[in-house]
Amino acid sequence: MDATLDADAARMRDDASAIFHLREAQLSDLTSIARVWHTAFFNDEIIGDIMHPHRQQHPEDVYWFLLRGIRERFWNWRHRFIVVTTHNGKGAETVVGAADWRRLGTGGAQRDLLKVDPRTLIAPAIRTYQAISLRIFPNRAADTSRSSFLDTAVADSEKYWTGDRAECWDLHVCGVHPDYQGKGVGKLLAQWGVQEAEKEGPGTCASVLCGEKNRGFYGKAGLTVQVGGRKGEGGGIALFTK
């Protein structure tokens, strides 16, 4: 029975690989990533209900919120954006899922650019531009008192990435367009960081902060060890590979 299940799982992975293509995101992908996440997270408990209670009146403001974050983190060299694409009926490539993996610990610090590298000027320039644009065009979908809910939740979880788990690939965000959910796209994205951690050796692990309802999904990707969690509204669990 186990051998049959393993064979079925292998076929599903092969089928997903044949239909979809996993690659590192390019600058030209950023708006597509934001659009996929906008559709995937619009009714999400945290990004939708808690952070953007007025999203039905101002749906595009949620898109711009997501795009601002993507732009800033894309130029943070500790982050790696990974996309899954497919081809539509006209042969054009379409982004159907995307993940933002970040490298924590010393390994993350080693990815930073030298201060003399001119590319270090891009991130602060983008932050300044977006801060100005946000003053002119505020996020009308948001509850301003809870706009930093997600950042605060991540900051409160820093205690998990210590000791043997200090060197880690953390799945910061992962979203798949609803039309492609349940087809292996999310698993491809989740397994990318798990495999990167394995390549680096036993001193590196992978992790994700997620809701209890997603435990089974991430468990299938190898994130099976629960280290901690948050109770209350928007609470979740921290899953690691070890």
Q: Where on the chain are the PLM-derived regions?
A:
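A short beta-loop-alpha structural element at the N-terminal edge
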Residues: 21-35, 39, 44-47
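Conserved GNAT-fold acetyl-CoA-binding loop/helix
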Residues: 44-68
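A short helix-loop-beta-strand connector motif used in the catalytic cores of GNAT acetyltransferases and
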Residues: 61-83, 141-148, 166-170
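Conserved beta-hairpin
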Residues: 76-101, 177-180
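Conserved acyl-donor/pantetheine-binding loop and adjacent beta-alpha core of acyl/acetyltransferases
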Residues: 92, 100-175, 181
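Conserved GNAT acetyl-CoA-binding A-motif
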Residues: 167-169, 196-210
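Conserved acetyl-CoA-binding loop-helix of GNAT-fold acetyltransferases
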Residues: 176, 182-195
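Conserved active-site alpha-helix within GNAT-family acetyltransferase domains
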Residues: 183, 187, 199-202, 212-234
